[in-house]
């Protein structure tokens, strides 16, 4: 007996409620009591220890796709960390927002870093979880369409910089 049939569909891992759920809007607008002014994470470096990051996501672009905010690399323009160093496997993938990354999976002694295990050298995300958590915390604002409805999504601190640590 078949009791339920549902259409298969894939839903992108985008969040639109994080900032609202924690009350970030008054901090962003500077209307929070005692706030010296609007604040969206400028001068914060967020480290995410997870499954890596999707380098191609607009959530981690050097320029915010919604308001055009140009991120400032606190290390200095063109200076990056970890596998984004000039001789690293991720050289050329970092930018003023995504300022570095480290690979603790493929770089671990005895680890089987092969395609069959869905791992590759560097801190690229092979399953999406690290990308989702990093964008929830510090992803740029983005205009997206979800279930045919336009939405604007954002990390809690969209103007923060990010260093990704691929640990799983």
Report residues per predicted region.
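Autoinhibitory propeptides
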Residues: 1-45, 56-66
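Loop/turn elements at helix/coil->beta-strand transitions in domains of secreted/extracellular proteins
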Residues: 2-4, 41-46, 93-97, 158-163
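Residue-level detector of buried hydrophobic side-chain packing
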Residues: 4-5, 50-52, 133, 162
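Acidic glycine-/aspartate-rich tracts in secreted/extracellular proteins
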Residues: 10-12, 51-55, 60, 105, ...
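Subtilisin-like peptidase catalytic core
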Residues: 100-168
């Amino acid at each position: 007996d078949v009791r339920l049939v549902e259409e298969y569909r894939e839903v992108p891992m985008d969040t639109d409620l994080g900032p609202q759920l924690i009350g970030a809007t008054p901090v962003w607008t500077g209307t929070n009591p005692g706030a010296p002014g609007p604040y969206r994470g400028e001068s914060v470096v967020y480290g995410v220890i997870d499954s890596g990051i999707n380098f191609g996501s607009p959530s981690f672009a050097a320029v915010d796709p919604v308001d055009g905010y140009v991120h400032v690399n606190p290390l200095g323009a063109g200076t990056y960390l970890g596998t984004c160093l000039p001789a690293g496997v991720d050289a050329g993938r970092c930018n003023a927002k995504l300022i570095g990354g480290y690979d603790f999976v493929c770089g671990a002694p005895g680890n089987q870093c092969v395609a069959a295990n869905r791992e590759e050298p560097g801190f690229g995300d092979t399953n999406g979880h690290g990308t989702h958590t990093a964008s929830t915390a510090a992803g740029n604002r983005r205009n997206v369409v979800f279930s045919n409805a336009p939405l604007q999504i954002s990390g809690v601190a969209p103007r923060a910089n990010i260093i990704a640590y691929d640990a799983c």
